[in-house]
Design a protein with these regions (language model features):
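N-terminal binding-site loop/beta-alpha segment at the start of enzyme catalytic domains
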Residues: 1-72, 102
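Glycine/proline-rich, positively charged
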Residues: 26, 39, 43, 66, ...
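Generic beta-sheet signal
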Residues: 75-77
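A short acidic, glycine/proline-enriched capping/turn motif at secondary-structure boundaries
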Residues: 79-83
Length: 110
């Protein structure tokens, strides 16, 4: 870690998250290696994983954290074209299906 950097960000509810995350933009070309890399990152404390419906990597992230979901902090994003109230709900449901989980830790507008 960078000298002087906080090791965790603590939310009001006490949940702690690493301030550095693993991005998944343009992943998917070397799927097995990328899944192993994401898992290794979580094992080493890089628990925040950033994905988005636009990236097409939510299924990859879901596979990577299948056995360690409680340790991972998943961030995903809705496309602006899906950002109406109903559209966001539908997009989130699709993201949950692709991730293979029943919750996303932080859901953002892309």
């Amino acid at each position: 870690m960078i000298s002087g950097m906080q090791r965790h960000i603590t939310f009001r509810d006490g949940q702690q998250v690493c301030p550095l995350g693993q991005g998944t933009y343009q992943m998917g070309r070397r799927r097995n290696e990328e899944i192993k890399a994401l898992r290794r990152g979580v094992d080493l404390g890089l628990t925040l994983i950033d994905t988005a419906e636009m990236y097409g990597t939510e299924d990859l992230v879901g596979e990577a954290v299948r056995d360690c979901r409680e340790q991972a902090f998943i961030v995903s994003k809705v496309l602006p074209s899906n950002a109406s109230y109903e559209g966001t709900k539908r997009a989130c449901e699709r993201s949950l299906m692709r991730l293979g989980t029943d919750y996303i830790d932080l859901y953002l507008l892309h």
